[in-house]
Structures are given as C-alpha cells and as structure tokens.
Amino acid sequence: MGKLKSVVFDALPEHETCWSLTTAPNGKIYIGVCGELTGGLSVFLVQYDPETETTEYLLDVGEALGRSARSGATPISKVHYGMIPGHDGKLYCATHFSGPPVTDVVWRPWQTWDDPVRMACGLCLFTYDT
C-alpha cells in the first residue's frame, strides 16, 4: 500500500483550490494554487520537491503578468488544467478567471463584463523556466 503525504501551503492561507498539477523532467512537482472564493487573490505557481519534501513559492502569476489581484479588476485566479512540462525545461501554462475582484464577495462574471475597471482581461498563456 502506498504512503499518503499531505502538503499544506502555509504561506497561502486564503487560497483554497488546486486545478493544475504536473511533474517536470527535473522530478519536481508544480502546482497552481488558486484563490476562487475570496476576492482579490491571484494564482501562485508553487514547486514541491518530493526528494527533500520542501515547498517553494515561485511566482504570483497575476503580479508577474502585470495584473495585480488588488487592482479592483477580476484577478488571474487560476491555472486551469493547462500546465504542460516541455522537453525544453519550461512549463507551459494557461490562466483562467474564476475569483471575484477584491471589491466583490462573490464571483459574478456578468457583473464585470462591461465594467472597464473590474472586467477580466482575457486568458493569458505564459511559460516558466524550471
């Protein structure tokens, strides 16, 4: 029988979902730690090393893409299923919007579509060099 190991993301206490998980050629596991229920949270790219059992918080994706989760706009809150390790050592990722702006309690996309401040900017594709 296999061993069950829980990894807790202590540095992200308000983030509550993970929609993306992959193992890269370097043997490390990469996770998109998402914030969908609390307004104004950005997705984080986190690395877990199963050999050393250490966690490293690599990237606030929204900040890295110039879209601060605290700006009042719909935040980049999720890496949604799209996290592909390439043979070139890069992760190829796709973002998604599913968390409310910092000013909202609940995500209601139809209330932000025509708001020039709160609207989502569209999906983003990005790479991360592992």
Question: What does each model-identified segment do?
Answer:
Residues D49-T52, Y128-T130:
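Short loop/turn segments that connect beta-strands within beta-propeller blades
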Residues K5-D10, Y57-P75:
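Surface-exposed loop and turn segments in beta-propeller and other repeat-based domains
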Residues V43-V46, C124-F126:
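A short loop-to-beta-strand structural motif that recurs across blades of beta-propeller domains
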Residues M1-K3:
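Blade/loop signatures of beta-propeller domains
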Residues T17-P25, G72-D88, P100:
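Structural signature of eukaryotic scaffold interfaces centered on beta-propeller domains
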Residues G32-V43, C93-A120:
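Short, conserved, GDST-rich strand-edge loop motifs in beta-rich repeat architectures
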